[in-house]
């Protein structure tokens, strides 16, 4: 039977000093012997998805203490990708995932903590906390801050929903007046919470539901709604129960590595493909597999992407549906129910509620349930008032969206496509794979695209070219040396794709990169090209006006040049000596911390994790 980890710091005469310090934090005589549970918060005033989390940590802590534990809260960092985007700040976003995981490990191990509740929300924070949970393998519960309400503006006497991407797009549109832009800017992000579409943050929070590490509704219930409070209260209760079961009853079935198996990672990517989630989720699931030592690779994702139907389109893939609409349609378990009907899921896996996925689907499927509490829960909707406060409104829809023909969630028979919203492309340009969010392609004829390359060695140069009309219809923009190692940091390319959209070129051009894309990206945008340019990938040898062939139907990405020409270009590149496979004209200041990240970073097909085998101990 495992011993409480915290006993290391509280038992025995020689731990008098440690106990004295625990007492100084408020621990009483009667508390010693209770499990010490960390509340890992990510409150910050920099990020709307985290602005409201300050009090929520205390909410969870009080519930832990009521339930028989000692709660101790600490914070991680949290970067807002939207604010960091379009300048050198984005270099720090992906590396922050590792920094978050490491900082949690340091705090948990240094203080011999028994378990943790992770309060996350936005893009790299949820993945960083997931990596930490798998690394530490102690009882863990996830509860996120929840999605933002969609923005609303009045256009021709009709309410139109908008989000952050609309503000970016109109910011680049020369035809948008300053008055109209200001109205959009003030309306796009009306409340606290993670941005209102199926971008990276909400995609990852939805995946924690199917992974079994959070409660139903965690990914879809609005940050502002009163019902969300119960998720935090429940987290405090459940973590104490699960912690005692592990340490006192030797029950390891609900540890992160027991829950997150290869079959469960498959469930997660199946959900992601069917709901057209962010392509960044692929990166994070691969990193989780690495952390848990699970043999889950791009080939597994490729095989699943060919047979999972696309059942849901939410902004940025749709201008009609947002996270508030997704929740009304049953959220994650609404989609899982449809996927289970066609036998795509492994439903025997347990979750933190100690329920199998099968039982959880049956209980929370809005098409089946007669439970008034569950019906009321999924009726939660937007308050449509600007606020930075959680639990500040209690609006409920009079009717749920149970339409599986043309509603927010569809059945297989009425799917948007037979194969899902994400696809893996391979070929000589992406030997180890690349990712495209097919859910974001509205023009089906764009699934086969061929054109001349326009090559740029930084996102900044590509943006300049787009905004100054150097890009023409039919071009394929190549942005290289923006991978995990080459960037370093694998920047998101939301600005280039948004600017293409603002200039009416999003359906007439393609963009390929060894960098990555925001969950808000649309159009023919292929990222995660592996190996990246800095790891001697063929993308480093593409020249202007080379013809590139993209075939999403056949899952291929090819540079149309001969093997002899490739050999000559390799020789020429390698003759650059120590400067081989580095950008030729880029002016970019790289900090020491980013240089360290670059030294160990792997390409996207490995989840952009650090290759620790480069370190000899």
Swiss-Prot record:
Gene Ontology MF annotations: 2 iron, 2 sulfur cluster binding; dihydroxy-acid dehydratase activity; magnesium ion binding
PROSITE patterns tied to this protein: ILVD_EDD_1, ILVD_EDD_2
InterPro entries listed in its UniProt record: Dihydro-acid_dehy_C (IPR042096), DihydroxyA_deHydtase (IPR004404), DiOHA_6PGluconate_deHydtase_CS (IPR020558), ILV_EDD_C (IPR056740), ILV_EDD_N (IPR000581), IlvD/EDD_N (IPR037237)
Biological processes, Gene Ontology terms: isoleucine biosynthetic process; L-valine biosynthetic process
Pfam annotation, one family: ILVD_EDD_N
GO cellular component: cytosol
Residue numbers of N6-carboxylysine PTMs: 124
Keyword Transport tagged: no
Membership in a protein family: Belongs to the IlvD/Edd family.
Record PANTHER family: D-XYLONATE DEHYDRATASE, D-XYLONATE DEHYDRATASE YAGF-RELATED
Protein name per the record: Dihydroxy-acid dehydratase
Name of the gene: ilvD
């Amino acid at each position: 039977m495992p011993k409480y980890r915290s006993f290391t710091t509280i038992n025995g005469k020689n731990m008098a000093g440690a106990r004295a310090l625990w007492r100084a934090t408020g621990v009483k005589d009667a508390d010693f012997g209770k499990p010490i549970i960390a509340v890992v918060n990510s409150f910050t005033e920099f990020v709307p998805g985290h602005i409201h989390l300050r009090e929520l940590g205390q909410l969870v802590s009080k519930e832990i203490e009521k339930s028989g534990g000692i709660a101790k809260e600490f914070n991680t960092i949290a970067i807002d990708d939207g604010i960091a985007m379009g300048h050198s700040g984005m270099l720090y976003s992906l590396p922050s995932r590792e920094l978050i995981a490491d900082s949690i490990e340091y705090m948990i191990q240094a203080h011999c903590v028994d378990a943790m509740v992770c309060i996350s929300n936005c893009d790299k924070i949820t993945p960083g906390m997931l990596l930490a949970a798998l690394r530490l393998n102690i009882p863990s519960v996830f509860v996120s801050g929840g999605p933002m309400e969609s923005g609303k503006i009045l256009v021709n006497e009709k309410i139109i929903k908008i989000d952050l991407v609309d503000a970016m797009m109109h910011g680049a549109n020369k035809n948008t007046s300053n008055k109209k832009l200001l109205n959009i800017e003030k309306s796009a992000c009306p409340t606290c919470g993670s941005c209102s579409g199926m971008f990276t943050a909400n995609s990852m929070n939805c995946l924690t539901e199917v992974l079994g590490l959070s409660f139903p509704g965690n990914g879809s219930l609005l940050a502002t709604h009163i019902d969300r409070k119960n998720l935090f209260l429940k987290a405090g209760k459940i973590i104490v129960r699960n912690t005692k079961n592990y340490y006192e009853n030797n029950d390891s079935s609900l540890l992160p590595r027991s829950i997150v198996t290869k079959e469960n990672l498959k469930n997660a990517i199946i959900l992601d493909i069917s709901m057209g989630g962010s392509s960044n989720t692929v990166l994070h699931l691969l990193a989780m597999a690495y952390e848990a030592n699970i043999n889950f690779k791009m080939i597994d994702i490729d095989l699943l992407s060919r047979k999972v139907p696309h059942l849901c389109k939410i902004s940025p893939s749709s201008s009609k549906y947002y996270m508030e609409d997704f929740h009304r349609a049953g959220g994650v378990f609404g989609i899982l129910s449809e996927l289970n009907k066609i036998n795509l899921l492994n439903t025997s896996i347990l979750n933190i509620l100690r329920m199998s996925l099968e039982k959880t689907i049956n209980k929370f499927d809005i098409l089946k349930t007669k439970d008034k509490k569950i019906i009321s829960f999924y009726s939660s909707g937007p308050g449509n008032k600007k606020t930075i406060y959680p639990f500040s409104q209690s609006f409920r829809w009079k009717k749920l969206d149970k339409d599986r023909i043309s509603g927010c969630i569809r059945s297989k028979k009425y799917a948007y496509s037979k194969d899902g919203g994400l696809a893996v492309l391979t070929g000589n340009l992406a030997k180890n794979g690349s990712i495209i969010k097919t859910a974001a392609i509205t023009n089906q004829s764009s699934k086969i695209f061929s054109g001349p390359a326009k090559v740029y060695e930084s996102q900044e140069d590509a943006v300049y070219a787009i905004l100054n009309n150097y890009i023409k219809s039919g071009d394929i923009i190549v942005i290289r040396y923006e991978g995990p190692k080459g960037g370093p940091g694998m920047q998101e390319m939301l600005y280039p794709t948004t600017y293409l959209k603002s200039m009416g070129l999003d359906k007439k051009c393609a963009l390929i990169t060894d960098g990555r894309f925001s969950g808000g990206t649309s159009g023919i945008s292929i990222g995660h090209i592996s190996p990246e340019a800095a790891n001697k990938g063929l993308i480093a040898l593409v020249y202007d006006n080379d013809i590139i062939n993209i075939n999403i139907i056949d899952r291929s990405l090819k540079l149309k040049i001969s093997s002899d020409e490739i050999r000559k270009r390799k020789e020429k590149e390698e003759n650059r000596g120590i400067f081989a496979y580095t950008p030729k004209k880029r002016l970019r200041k790289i900090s020491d911390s980013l240089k360290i990240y670059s030294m160990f970073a792997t390409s996207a097909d490995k989840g952009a994790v650090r290759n620790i085998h480069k370190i000899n101990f």
